[in-house]
UniProtKB/Swiss-Prot annotation:
Gene: prpD2
Residues annotated as signal peptide: none
InterPro entries linked to this entry: 2-Methylcitrate_Dehydratase, MmgE/PrpD_sf, MmgE/PrpD_sf_1, MmgE/PrpD_sf_2, MmgE_PrpD, MmgE_PrpD_C, MmgE_PrpD_N
Biological role stated in the UniProt entry: Involved in the catabolism of short chain fatty acids (SCFA) via the 2-methylcitrate cycle I (propionate degradation route). Catalyzes the dehydration of 2-methylcitrate (2-MC) to yield the cis isomer 2-methyl-aconitate. Could also catalyze the dehydration of citrate and the hydration of cis-aconitate.
Organism: Corynebacterium glutamicum (strain ATCC 13032 / DSM 20300 / JCM 1318 / BCRC 11384 / CCUG 27702 / LMG 3730 / NBRC 12168 / NCIMB 10025 / NRRL B-2784 / 534)
NCBIfam families named among the record's database cross-references: PrpD_hiGCgrampos
Additional note from the record: The prpD2B2C2 operon is essential for growth on propionate as sole carbon source.
Protein's UniProt name: 2-methylcitrate dehydratase 2
Induction, per UniProt: By propionate.
């Protein structure tokens, strides 16, 4: 890996085009390096993982709405892209929007956390849609996805967005554009222009994840994927981008991030170096913000222990979660969001409330992507009482481990201190989720398949499940990427909410 220093350059400075970060990323994307076998296997795992959460979310309103947007844009010339659940082909950028929304809706797919947050599986829907549009095969798709993960993960390692209240999809637009560039074997300059356009059109504020969180949380990465496809299309037609997009005097760093004098360090693979960043990412066993994965497992375990000791949760006086800066301020009481304690809050808000999540997991000693968020569950009187006794505090040691570059030390956990009214104190901690590569039950192919089977049950026919799993595990051999789509029976889709007509 090569560490690249990135800073603002005034327009009067000499700053060669080849030194622009977008150009360096484009060179990585254009590098025809082979994808290693373990990387390919993990990409296949994540294709399966995305399909799992699409199956679980397909009947939800935001996903049904996004699907309706794609359905009014059918393509009949043999091109286009597939939409999860549907037969036929649709405009690729709108298929990417529909599929991306389904992937993100339940907060249930993969994650990478460093200086910034990310869900790099969001790269897959736009890259797959572009591949289907262009008639590419599985080997090309895998190369494109490897690039998408590589670029997003390394931007996340080196450039914090949230401290300036910029949403993390600003790293996704460029990474998806770069991945599509790899997929299509585009030249460096075309990829460079596409990256610049994709970044320019996907910078947005973090209000999408603050306060009363709406369905836009699911649409945001899907929209970035749509923008990346359109950016590539324009660049292929010879259109340019604002440049230098990151380093310009009126660019992203100068006015949206840390300003004129700040230097970021972005690691990127050297020429000929394999793209392996996907191996540093991790998926979710539970449908909730990643920083709550270990606390959910901790709560389940502590719930069992408290019950075995005869301790009653109704006698709890307080619960304090000692955790990292990010966890405290994003999903904890450091956010100062009263909505995180509101039983009438949206599901999107509750899955960003570690207080709600820990209370329910502690009581139920389990977590379910639907039942744990049901309105009747959130309104349970004893849950509300327990929920309001929970707070978070930042612990410098957890913050240090969160940002550690040592995989053996990096952690996203918490220490829970439960104090009962009689003075009894019970505490425990968990550094990483059970499903984490270093956890109690690390996810491998078997677990990805089980997650798919579990979430697809009652939605996807068993025959279609078998067909998809066979195709997905042969992605590198596929010539027709429509095999990676899943079609649902009409009676299943009929259960989706009725969506009002839009403009189109």
């Amino acid at each position: 890996m090569i560490n690249h220093e990135v800073r603002t350059h005034r327009s009067a400075e000499e700053f060669p085009y080849e030194e622009h970060l977008a150009h360096k990323i484009a060179r990585v994307a254009a590098d025809p390096v082979e994808v290693a076998a373990d990387t390919q296997e993990m990409i296949i795992n994540r294709i399966i993982d995305n399909a799992s959460v699409q199956a679980a979310s397909v009947l939800r309103r935001p996903v049904s709405s996004a699907r309706a947007m794609a359905q009014v844009r059918p393509v009949t010339d043999g091109r286009g892209a597939s939409v999860f659940g549907l037969p036929g082909r649709y405009a690729a950028e709108w298929a990417a929007l529909a599929n991306g929304t389904a992937v993100r809706e339940l907060d249930f797919h993969d994650t990478f956390l460093a200086a910034e947050y990310s869900h790099p599986g969001d790269n897959i829907p736009p890259i797959l849609a572009a591949a289907q549009q262009a008639g590419k095969g599985g080997k090309d798709l895998i190369r494109g996805i490897a690039t998408g993960y590589e670029i997003q993960v390394n931007l996340v390692r080196g450039m914090c967005l949230h401290e300036h209240k910029i949403d993390h999809v600003a790293h996704l637009g460029p990474s998806a554009a770069a991945g599509i560039g790899t997929l299509l074997d585009l030249d460096v300059d075309t990829i460079y222009q596409a990256i610049g356009q994709a970044l320019h059109t996907t910078t947005a504020t973090r209000q999408s994840r603050k306060g009363a969180i709406s369905s836009w949380k699911a649409f945001a990465p899907a929209f970035a994927g749509k923008m990346s496809i359109e950016a590539v299309d324009r660049a292929m037609r010879g259109e340019g981008a604002p440049s230098p997009i990151w380093e310009g005097e009126d660019g992203v760093i100068a006015w949206l991030l840390s300003g004129l004098d700040h230097i970021y360090t972005i690691p990127l693979p050297a020429e000929g170096e394999a793209k392996r960043a996907i191996l540093d990412t991790y998926t979710k066993e539970h449908s909730a913000e990643y920083q709550s994965q270990a606390p959910i497992d901790l709560a389940r375990s502590m719930g069992e222990k408290l019950a075995a000791q005869g301790l009653d949760l109704r006698d709890v006086d307080s619960i304090v979660l000692h955790t990292s800066h990010h966890t405290h301020y994003v999903i904890g009481t450091g956010s100062n969001d009263p909505q995180k304690f509101d039983p009438d809050a949206s599901r999107e808000t509750l899955d960003h409330s570690i207080m709600y999540i820990f209370a329910v997991a502690l009581e139920d000693r389990a977590w379910h992507h639907e039942r744990s968020y049901a309105p009747e569950r959130a309104h349970r009187r004893e849950t509300i009482e327990l929920w309001n006794k929970i707070s978070t505090v930042e612990d410098p040691e957890w913050t240090r481990r969160y940002h550690s570059v040592d995989p053996a030390e990096k952690a996203f956990g918490a220490r829970a201190v439960i104090t009962f009214k009689d003075g009894t104190v019970v505490e425990d901690e968990l550094a990483v989720a059970d499903a984490h590569p270093l956890g109690a039950r690390p996810f491998a192919r078997e677990q990805y398949i089980q997650k798919f089977r579990t979430l697809a049950e009652g939605v996807v026919s068993e025959k279609e499940q078998d067909r998809f799993l066979d195709a997905a595990q042969r992605t590198h051999e596929l010539e027709d990427l429509s095999e990676l789509n899943i079609e649902l029976d009409a009676d299943i889709l009929a259960k989706a909410p009725v969506i009002p007509e839009g403009l189109f």
